[in-house]
Amino acid sequence: MEKLTEKEKELIRVSWESLGKDKVPHGVIMFSRLFELEPALLNLFHYNTNCGTIQDCLSSPEFLDHVTKVMLVIDAAVSHLDNLHTLEDFLLNLGKKHQAVGVNTQSFAVVGESLLYMLQCSLGQGYTAPLRQAWLNMYTIVVAAMSRGWAKNGEHKTD
Ligand code: HEM
């Protein structure tokens, strides 16, 4: 696993904390952007609620639960910046689960772009080039582990 510099860790920790305790509204900004960039992802959420339009989906409790889960994973990564490898098994498993529900690894990159978009909206002037790079580096580590799990699950299915 790649390592982050101490400066990058500091930028990530301080900016994440500055978003406040309730991360869900920031997650909603992130997913609104994701669906703008890749509307087909809406179809992967097979909840009872009608997820026909972006607005229907974004306001459904099940969907907000998923947003909460995503923010908790990011929160776990931010809390483990010194030892991200301890999340490896969890992230492998998460990648496997997403392979099973039909998410492509290319979409993980679009999630990354949406995460940066959310940070830009939420941090305003605080969104600087080094901060952007720090988050991108962390997200790349998380997604690399998820993608390894995704690939393992894919292999399994074709055995
Ligand atoms: C490409 C965009 C994504 C789509 C379309 C997607 C879709 C889904 C779906 C359909 C489920 C199963 C239903 C549910 O639990 O709500 C799920 C579960 C989950 N997702 Fe995602 N997801 C995406 C990205 C992510 C990302 C980036 C993370 C975290 C970094 C994440 C974290 C989770 C977690 C923690 C679960 C619960 C897994 C479990 O049941 O153990 N998802 N996702």
Swiss-Prot record:
Q: Source organism's superkingdom?
A: Eukaryota
Which of this chain's residues are annotated to bind heme b? 66, 98
Q: Which GO terms describe its biological process?
A: cellular response to hypoxia
Q: Please name the GO terms that the record assigns under molecular function.
A: GDP-dissociation inhibitor activity; heme binding; metal ion binding; nitrite reductase activity; oxygen binding
Occurrences of domain Globin (ranges): 3-151
Q: Which UniProt keywords apply?
A: Cytoplasm, Heme, Iron, Metal-binding, Mitochondrion, Oxidoreductase
What are the subcellular locations of this protein?
Cytoplasm, Cytosol; Mitochondrion matrix
Q: What is this protein's record name?
A: Neuroglobin-1
Q: What is the lineage of its organism?
A: Eukaryota, Metazoa, Chordata, Craniata, Vertebrata
Gene symbol of the encoding locus: ngb1
